[in-house]
């Protein structure tokens, strides 16, 4: 059967109010999406991660009284200071929503050897290195340029018998990719307990021996170091945490930083030059990856 769909574009702080309003008006379900397909980075503790511009969608039965619902939403928008609400109302045909969502995700190749593949898809190349990973709300799945840049770099280097730290690990995608590419063991570091569960679950899904993987919440031991460190977070935290992240890299070890817009790259480079020789800066869709080798 058809449905009445109401979509509201708003800011994260107004999302709960619009969600409650839609549910109070009789919405069968309310969902959140990103307006501009931006990434959601790992959330702080006890927070719900949302995009800077969020689309709130409510689905109602087709015969819902829109003449009653519309003014209720407009009144709520006015009370929130949104005098010109961005709202779209339409009738949509019934469909298998779960199937449509799943159909949007396909195996993706990163570099020469590495693929990331949803669990419901057939592995495209049985001889390739395949990381099985399903999409989730807060953590990376390889679709964003910053994650792609890091995965491509891991595919291009020699991970064999190395140790790797995935700083801000989220889903653990980067560290697990390193293990599949030959690293001996990996340590994931994150401030969110959800990351521990997500990384361990994804490692199990990829048949990683638990002895090769550990996920830590701060504080961690002061002498922790690895041959390879990957940090895909944001430019501000990367610059602020430069001494902390640099200390995790062994002498002559490799560091890859991403989550950085092109116009932020110089700030991050300057924060790390004390400890690293910058080997390369790679740009993809206005995002960059900075790679360096630690001084002996």
From Swiss-Prot:
InterPro entries in alphabetical order: Ribosomal_L11_MeTrfase_PrmA, Ribosomal_PrmA_MeTrfase, SAM-dependent_MTases_sf
Residues binding S-adenosyl-L-methionine: 147, 168, 190, 232
Cross-referenced SUPFAM superfamilies: S-adenosyl-L-methionine-dependent methyltransferases (SSF53335)
Gene Ontology biological process: methylation
EC number of this enzyme: 2.1.1.-
GO cellular component annotations of the record: cytosol
GO molecular-function terms, A-Z: protein-lysine N-methyltransferase activity
Keywords: Cytoplasm, Methyltransferase, S-adenosyl-L-methionine, Transferase
Subcellular location: Cytoplasm
Catalytic activity: L-lysyl-[protein] + 3 S-adenosyl-L-methionine = N(6),N(6),N(6)-trimethyl-L-lysyl-[protein] + 3 S-adenosyl-L-homocysteine + 3 H(+)
Recorded family membership: Belongs to the methyltransferase superfamily. PrmA family.
HAMAP family: Methyltr_PrmA
General function of this protein: Methylates ribosomal protein L11.
Name listed for the protein in its UniProt record: Ribosomal protein L11 methyltransferase
Gene of this entry: prmA
